[in-house]
């Protein structure tokens, strides 16, 4: 059953169109990698899926999803964020506060469980800014998990990580998808990772987008012709 259906979707920013008439769907338990050149609209799509940006045309239909966990790209300012690991993970529950001013016992328990699931419980009292890049990404992934058990939107989750931390992050995401059936939508420039882990690939480009299985993508012109524009 589809959790997200994008129908005839058109997106743009600053008055410039980045994609038009895009159609794809995401089912429960899917692992969709979104690839494409810079400026093709990948991050704009993430904002639209999160409800932070209205489409220029078409529609986004969500079924059975109350909350979406989001792991954004980090900048240098965010890497030095002055908070403990526990506080960062707990902030994933902000959307569930509603009119409440304080976190509940359930919120705090959820944060502890997410830290334990990702193996960072011993870091709970450490300052986020003192952690390595790989540890910080684990914390942000735990924060996204704390928001939801249904779907994760990950925008370049391995950006800036060394090879060992990159492999660790990909394995974590894959386990959450395979073992816990959490739906994953991940923006990436790493085509090899998309082919290794994803069940489907959405290639965004100026020409009609490609949307199919990872195996079909491997055999498509999008992948064959310099991994560039689609010529389907």
Task: Indicate residue ranges for each PLM-predicted region.
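Conserved ABC ATPase signature
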Residues: 127-131, 135
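H-loop (His-switch) and adjacent beta-strand-loop-beta switch element
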Residues: 200-214
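H-loop/switch region of ABC-family ATPase nucleotide-binding domains
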Residues: 188-189
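Catalytic Walker B motif of ABC-type/P-loop ATPase nucleotide-binding domains
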Residues: 152-155
